[in-house]
């Protein structure tokens, strides 16, 4: 299967540049994965498609304001840092621009000097291993100095950092938001629970690999970047009980979906677990635990488009995407949603 098989025409004006003012009023395309039938709704209508036996699995990761603008200690030259992955307490794998100024031993200053950094090693694909020096709590300093690491296709500034966080975000560590979850409000989640639907939370810290293009022609040759995940005993029990009682396990977002499929055994059972996953789901993959998926509209030729094609069938997905373009749905991180049922 070739990468070009997952291409589609997307006019640039359909790439959403701002989050919706009211999260749950984005549009919702409902796709029946068996018949390919499509319905057009508003996100809050998701309630009508959930039944008391169902379980929604949500990723409670929180996006770090991981983009830092600083200067080189010796020269004062402007530098941009993007924190990718925590290696140990104050050591991060980081993308640094311009890279040529970030050799081992180079030192940098951020803000008024309350945060300093030194390159202590080279990482994968041109990244740098950076050690940070500061007094106080790193997350608080990052909150003051850092900016949200918005995807490259969002050109406009984000006025409110919280609009790029889900209302249930808790565990800090992501370089990007699990965007399907951005559509939920606290009120909508409450209504969902009142209907008898269980909410179960897991964590997957989204890495920047999520925006990296597939650079091989044959999709089977593509290698995913690994991302940290964890699921506790309580969540595992809710999911296993749902399956046993004939309910659906509905993943909110591709990150929840990939975590569930990483942890599930052949029989679709899950357990308390943490680790790193580089699972790559594409057509031909047989889902073990996920029955349905709430997700946004993904980039042409992306691994996430391949993941949804594995769940609903490539023809159904490509047809739904062409309909979404025709009906002017908003695409990508701040865009509209799709429910694959």
UniProtKB/Swiss-Prot annotation:
InterPro entries xref list: QueA (IPR003699), QueA_dom1 (IPR042118), QueA_dom2 (IPR042119), QueA_sf (IPR036100)
PANTHER family associated with the record: S-ADENOSYLMETHIONINE:TRNA RIBOSYLTRANSFERASE-ISOMERASE
Keyword Transferase: yes
Keyword Chaperone attributed: no
Record protein name field: S-adenosylmethionine:tRNA ribosyltransferase-isomerase
Residues spanning the signal sequence: none
Sequence similarity: Belongs to the QueA family.
SUPFAM superfamilies associated with the record: QueA-like
Classification of source organism: Bacteria, Bacillati, Bacillota, Clostridia, Eubacteriales
One Gene Ontology molecular-function label: S-adenosylmethionine:tRNA ribosyltransferase-isomerase activity
């Amino acid at each position: 299967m070739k990468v070009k098989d997952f291409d589609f025409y997307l006019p640039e004006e359909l790439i959403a540049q701002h989050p919706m003012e009211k999260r749950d009023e984005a549009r919702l395309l409902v796709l029946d994965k068996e018949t390919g039938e499509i319905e057009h709704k508003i996100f809050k209508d998701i309630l009508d498609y959930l039944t008391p036996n169902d379980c929604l699995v949500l990723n409670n990761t929180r996006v770090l304001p991981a983009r830092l603008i600083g200067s080189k200690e010796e020269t004062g030259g402007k530098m941009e840092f993007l924190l990718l992955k925590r290696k140990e307490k104050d050591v991060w794998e980081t993308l640094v621009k311009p890279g040529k100024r970030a050799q081992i031993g180079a030192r940098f200053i951020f803000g008024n000097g309350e945060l300093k950094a030194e390159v202590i090693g080279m990482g994968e694909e041109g990244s740098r291993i950076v050690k940070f020096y500061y007094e106080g709590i790193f997350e608080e300093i990052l909150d003051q100095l850092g900016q949200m690491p918005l995807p490259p296709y969002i050109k406009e500034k984000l006025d409110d950092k919280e609009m790029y966080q889900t209302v249930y975000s808790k565990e800090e560590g992501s370089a990007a938001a699990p965007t399907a979850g951005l559509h939920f409000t606290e009120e909508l989640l409450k209504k969902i629970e009142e209907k008898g639907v269980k909410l179960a939370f897991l964590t997957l810290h989204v890495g920047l690999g999520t925006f990296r293009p597939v650079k091989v022609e044959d999709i089977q040759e593509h290698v995913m970047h690994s991302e940290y995940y964890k699921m506790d005993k309580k969540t595992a029990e809710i999911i296993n009980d749902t399956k046993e009682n004939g309910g659906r396990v509905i993943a909110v977002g591709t990150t929840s979906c990939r975590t569930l499929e990483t942890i599930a055994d052949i029989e679709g059972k899950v357990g308390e677990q943490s680790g790193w996953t580089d699972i790559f789901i594409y057509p031909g993959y047989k889902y073990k635990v996920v029955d349905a998926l709430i997700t946004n509209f993904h980039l042409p030729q992306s691994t996430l488009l391949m993941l949804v094609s594995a769940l609903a069938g490539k023809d159904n997905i490509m047809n739904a995407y062409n309909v979404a373009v025709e009906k002017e749905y908003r695409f990508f991180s701040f865009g509209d949603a799709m429910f694959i049922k």
